[in-house]
């Protein structure tokens, strides 16, 4: 799966791990676009919430945006350079793609319930607990990327 040299062409007629191929195909079957979901009622429901409930709702979306931003990028950046099987590459790319769909769905919700979505987005990275939550996850990717960068760039010896 990993560290066996890069994969060349994407062949799906011969896969080493059919379970990975099955997971990818199943995941692709769940594809959807946020705009396909009617959320017109959400704005009215949001307005009916108390200020405290609106705060909880919005804070949850902010946290999810940060987490899905990390998960939408980091698996590709961290794992793909190490990957050696096309079916695993495709699964990783599919996983990251779905995380970006999640993030886009939160944007879709925020656009629908806030007159000025910038009010929500502009301060996300100023909320310490949310930033720390993102850092708690991204540190593992950062560590892997640092080690793999060193591994991938070290000169090799013929013996």
Regions found by a protein language model. Give the residues of each.
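Single conserved hydrophobic/aromatic residue that forms the stacking wall/gate
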Residues: 151-159
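Non-heme di-metal
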Residues: 1-152
């Amino acid at each position: 799966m990993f560290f066996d040299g890069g994969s060349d062409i994407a062949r799906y007629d011969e896969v080493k791990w059919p379970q990975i191929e099955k997971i990818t195909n199943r995941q692709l079957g769940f594809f959807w676009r946020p705009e396909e979901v009617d959320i017109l009622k959400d704005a009215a429901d949001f307005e009916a919430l108390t200020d405290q409930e609106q705060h909880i709702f919005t804070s949850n979306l902010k946290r999810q945006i940060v987490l899905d931003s990390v998960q939408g990028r980091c698996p590709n950046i961290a794992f793909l350079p190490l990957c050696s099987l096309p079916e695993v590459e495709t699964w990783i790319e599919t996983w990251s793609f779905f995380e970006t769909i999640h993030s886009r769905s939160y944007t879709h919700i925020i656009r629908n319930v806030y007159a000025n979505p910038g009010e929500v987005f502009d301060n996300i990275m100023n909320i310490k607990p949310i930033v720390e939550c993102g850092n708690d996850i991204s540190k593992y990717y950062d560590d892997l990327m640092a080690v793999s960068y060193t591994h991938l760039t070290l000169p090799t010896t013929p013996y």
